[in-house]
Amino acid sequence: MQLRYFLLLAAALFCIGIYGLITSRNAVRVLMSIELLLNAVNLNLMAFSNYLDSTLIKGQVFTVFVITVAAAEAAVGLAIVLAIYRNRDTVDMEQFNLLKW
């Protein structure tokens, strides 16, 4: 396949992630939107790695690193959301004013 198809798919994923990040008030949806953004970046890394030099695996190694960081981010983010839900009984981003007394 040509590079432009991968780039178009990655751009579409990135735009969907940005839209979800901007419009969503639910904390879990925000985390899912961030994961979409990271997957768009992974798709770009893999596409450019294959397009520029398919014998080197630098893009694949960096993609595995990004997937690992994304998994850790999701685990920490969900733990924070769960802790806030237990205290506030909501996952609405407007209600996350924890710095107020």
Swiss-Prot record:
Record's keyword annotation contains Glycoprotein: no
Primary localization class, coarse: membrane
GO cellular component, one term: NADH dehydrogenase complex
Enzyme class of the recorded protein, top EC level: translocase
EC number(s) recorded for this UniProt protein: 7.1.1.-
Subunit structure, interactors included: NDH-1 can be composed of about 15 different subunits; different subcomplexes with different compositions have been identified which probably have different functions.
Domain of life: Bacteria
S-S bridge residues: none
Record-level GO BP terms: ATP synthesis coupled electron transport; photosynthesis, light reaction
InterPro entries: NADH_UbQ_OxRdtase_chain4L/K (IPR001133), NUOK/Mnh_C1-like (IPR039428)
Location(s) in or outside the cell: Cellular thylakoid membrane
Name recorded for this polypeptide: NAD(P)H-quinone oxidoreductase subunit 4L
Reactions listed under catalytic activity: a plastoquinone + NADH + (n+1) H(+)(in) = a plastoquinol + NAD(+) + n H(+)(out); a plastoquinone + NADPH + (n+1) H(+)(in) = a plastoquinol + NADP(+) + n H(+)(out)
Entry keywords, A to Z: Membrane, NAD, NADP, Plastoquinone, Quinone, Thylakoid, Translocase, Transmembrane, Transmembrane helix, Transport
A GO molecular-function annotation: oxidoreductase activity, acting on NAD(P)H, quinone or similar compound as acceptor
Transmembrane segments: 3-23, 30-50, 64-84
